[in-house]
Design a protein with these regions (language model features):
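Noncatalytic regulatory segments and standalone regulatory/sensor domains
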Residues: 41-42, 53-105
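Active-site-adjacent substructure of cysteine-protease-like catalytic cores
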Residues: 7-66, 104
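Helix-adjacent hinge/juxtasegments
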Residues: 2-5
């Protein structure tokens, strides 16, 4: 297994990993009202697992701030999420994948 912490430029880069069945952990930060549907109102830093995208491009995550298992899976607005990620951490992403995939950045 290979693991890297890397800055990615946008959600399209995350999508390329998701399309290869590789989830990506991202660090987000947001103020009240900046990420609709989040289980916390604001945060200076919070890790989420991006696990997919809807047909319309919204971001499907596992958010550990959900109070119950059924509240962990969330779908966030793509533009709001990308802003919270890029402004919050500069695009920091944690990628863990089998070495055989030959991750390149």
């Amino acid at each position: 297994t290979e693991a890297v912490v890397h800055r990615l430029p946008d959600l399209r880069s995350v999508e390329s990993f998701i399309n290869k069945k590789v989830p990506v952990v991202v660090s987000v930060a947001f103020k009240k009202g900046e990420l609709s549907g989040a289980p916390i109102s604001s945060t200076p830093g919070h890790l989420l697992v991006v696990r997919g995208f809807t047909k319309t491009g919204q971001v499907i995550v596992n958010d550990p701030a959900g109070k119950t298992n059924s509240q962990v899976r969330r779908i966030y607005d793509r533009a709001q999420f990308e802003r919270a990620w890029l402004r919050g951490s500069g695009g920091i992403a944690y990628v863990i994948a089998p070495t055989s995939m030959g991750l390149t950045f």
